[in-house]
């Protein structure tokens, strides 16, 4: 149960950071929908930005290791609209110019979340973001994690945040 409580506490900074990044960089509000536990590895979007992180959390004076991963997935149309809003050009197809944009977004979200996580007693080491593109692509989550899927609505369309977290004893 303690791990579940830490997961809930761990999730909030990522949701808040995503909302902030989209308001300031994409000029669009994100409206979080009801989270669900994800039971498969298939992405809900066509383009996914993936970033792993690990670190320690202080639990009642005892250091506990954790590992986590954040995925933000976009349907193609949403990704093109987000790219257009951020870069000031119109995109209607997946081109090299916008390939890394999702990675930049997920990097900014995790960077913003890290500040709040630090205030909550977490240390965080970030991996390098990676991008996965294609209909019905799969995401490989860290072993032993449960994945929470948080759908978001925005003026640019829907997108999906997937977050997994586990404490390593």
Describe each model-derived feature in a short phrase.
Residues 1-169:
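N-terminal auxiliary interaction/assembly segments of multi-subunit proteins
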